[in-house]
Amino acid sequence: MLSSLGIVLPAYNEESRLWSALDELFEYLCSAPSGDLPELVSVLVVDDGSTDGTAALVRARPEFAAEGFALSRRDCPKLGLLTVPHGGKGSAVRAGMLVADGDALVFADADMATPPDQLGKLVRALETADVALGSRIQPDGSDMRATQPRFRRLVGRMFRVAAQLWVTGPVKDTQCGFKGFRRAAARDLFGRLRIRSIVFDVDLIYLARRRGYRMAIVPVNWADRRGSRMRARPKLALRVAWDLVRIRFVHRGVKRAPRESAAAE
């Protein structure tokens, strides 16, 4: 098993949901069966320029470590905080994944829509893959409990079809906010990331395919959580469509990674 795990949680105005989500995460980290997760972990909240008390909430946690993002024992985990100007989820995830510590690096939604007990699935997949993509729509093991509005679900399906045809190929669920990377792959891919909107996941997957990284699709459980600010609006739909078109052009010069760096840490 990989010897350490870094967890990145992007957060924007999550004051109302983050405390309970962190309770859930730390409870699992401390109680997970031996062998399910590495014994060394780091947890990093990236505050994406929140205008509420998100950052203050993180600093008030008993696990908060002012010294930064260092690894600690899983039975006594520490919590780090990185504050960045508001740039959207893609920018926040990128900032965290470029500094987080761990042989395996995972980013997850701050509301724990994918429960922490799914972390072990990504870590195990990264034993043989460079990139592990959580999927909510796999017939063999995922459980998606959605209460999203019908229109949002319809837009999501249309987006998945367009992304598959134009960019991601066999990857159906590009937008699951639960993805894992070996450290070398994370530093490479996030360093090259050009799309910072909600389409950043598609950009990552396209880059991973262009760079020749080994990808695993991992069925995970997922439940829609109240409080999401994501709304399907015409202006957003146009931005998404434009970013999908851009992806294949902004990375035209990207070449395959040397095999020794594609998963050899």
Language-model segments: residues:
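Acceptor/aglycone-binding surface of glycosyltransferases and processive sugar-polymer synthases
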Residues: K78, V84-V99, P116-I198, R225-K235, ...
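Short, well-formed alpha-helical segments that are part of the catalytic scaffolds
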Residues: E14-P33
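Acidic helix N-cap motif at the loop->helix transition within catalytic regions
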Residues: S16-S20, D52-R61
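Short beta-strand/loop segment that forms part of the nucleotide-sugar
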Residues: P33-G49, L82
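Hydrophobic helical membrane-anchoring modules
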Residues: M1-S4, T168-G169, R192-E265
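A conserved acidic beta->alpha catalytic loop
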Residues: D47-A56, M112
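Short aromatic/hydrophobic "clamp" motif used to bind/position activated sugar donors
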Residues: L105
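Hydrophobic targeting segments
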Residues: S3-L9, L18, L25, E39-V46
